[in-house]
C-alpha cells in the first residue's frame, strides 16, 4: 500500500519536522528536525516518479533508526495519519501472549465498539446511563471506523476513526472550543478512562460515583464501565493497555498527547 506524499509530510510535521523551502523547486519535500541535527528526510512530492516507493522506504528506515520504533509500526501510523486510532494491547503472560481464546477475541472487538459508542453518546447527550447505545451518529461512527491489522507486541487490536468522518457537533462542552466530532469522541474516551482508572488505583471509586451523579455532563457512563468489563477474561487474568494515536489534522493539548498507555488490570 503506497503512502501518499501528503500523508508522510503531515505525519512528519506533526512530530516536529519542518519543511525546508529550497526543495520545493525540485519537487522534493525536504524536512529537518532540531532534535536530530544534521539529519534530513527527503522524498518526492509526486508519487508517480519511479523511485518514490524506495524514497519513502528510506525515510521510514531513517525514522525507525532515529526513534527506535519498528519500521512497520511507523508505516502503520503514517497510513492512519488522518485518523484517531484506538489501540488495545492485551497482556496475558500465562497465555503466551501470541494468541487469544476465540470467545474473548470476539468480546474484545465488541468491547472496543462499545467504548466508542458510549463515548459518542456521551458527546451527543451526556448522562450517567444511556438507555440504548443507538444514537444515529454513534452507529455511523462505528460504520466509518476501521479494524486494523493486529500488531507485534502481544496482541494489539487497533481501531482507526477518520477524523472528518461525520460533520456533526455534540453538546458536551470542550475547553478547546470547536473540534471535529470524532476528536470529541476520542478525547472523551481518553479522558473518561483516565478518570476511571485513577479512581480505581487511588481507592476513590465511591467518591467518583457520587461526583458523577451530581455532574450535569458526566464524562463516564455505566455503558462505558460495561464496555470495560468486556476487555477482561477471568480465565486469562489479562491486563489491557489502552492508548490513542492522534491524527495530525487537529491540534491536541500536551496533557492529552503525552503519558503512558492507560492500564486496566
Per-region residue spans from a language model:
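N-terminal ordered "arm"
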Residues: 1-39, 45-46
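Generic detection of long, well-ordered alpha-helical segments
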Residues: 2, 49, 53, 102-106
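Residues in flexible loops and secondary-structure boundaries
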Residues: 11, 49-51, 250-252
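Long, continuous compositionally biased terminal/linker segments
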Residues: 27-84
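Long, hydrophobic alpha/beta structural blocks
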Residues: 72-264
Amino acid at each position: 500500500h503506497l503512502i501518499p506524499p501528503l500523508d508522510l509530510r503531515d505525519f512528519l510535521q506533526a512530530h516536529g519536522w519542518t519543511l525546508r523551502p529550497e526543495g520545493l523547486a525540485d519537487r522534493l519535500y525536504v524536512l529537518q528536525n532540531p532534535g536530530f541535527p544534521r539529519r534530513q528526510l527527503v522524498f518526492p512530492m509526486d508519487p508517480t516518479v519511479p523511485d518514490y516507493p524506495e524514497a519513502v522506504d528510506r525515510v521510514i528506515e531513517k525514522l525507525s533508526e532515529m526513534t527506535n520504533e519498528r519500521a512497520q509500526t511507523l508505516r502503520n501510523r503514517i497510513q492512519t495519519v488522518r485518523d484517531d486510532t484506538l489501540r488495545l494491547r492485551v497482556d496475558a503472560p500465562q497465555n503466551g501472549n501470541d494468541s487469544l481464546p476465540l470467545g474473548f477475541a470476539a468480546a474484545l472487538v465488541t468491547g472496543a465498539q462499545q467504548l466508542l459508542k458510549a463515548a459518542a453518546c456521551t458527546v451527543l447527550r451526556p448522562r450517567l446511563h444511556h438507555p440504548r447505545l443507538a444514537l444515529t451518529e454513534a452507529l455511523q461512527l462505528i460504520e466509518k471506523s476501521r479494524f486494523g491489522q493486529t500488531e507485534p507486541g502481544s496482541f494489539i487490536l487497533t481501531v482507526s476513526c477518520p477524523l472528518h468522518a461525520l460533520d456533526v457537533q455534540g453538546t458536551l462542552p470542550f475547553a478547546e472550543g470547536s473540534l471535529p466530532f470524532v476528536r470529541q469522541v476520542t478525547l472523551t474516551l481518553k479522558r473518561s478512562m483516565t478518570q476511571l482508572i485513577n479512581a480505581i488505583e487511588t481507592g476513590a471509586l465511591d467518591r467518583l460515583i457520587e461526583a458523577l451523579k451530581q455532574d450535569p455532563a458526566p464524562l463516564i457512563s455505566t455503558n462505558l464501565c460495561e464496555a470495560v468489563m468486556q476487555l477482561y477474561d477471568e480465565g486469562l487474568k489479562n491486563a489491557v493497555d489502552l492508548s490513542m494515536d492522534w491524527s495530525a489534522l487537529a491540534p491536541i493539548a500536551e496533557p492529552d498527547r503525552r503519558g503512558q498507555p492507560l492500564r486496566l488490570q
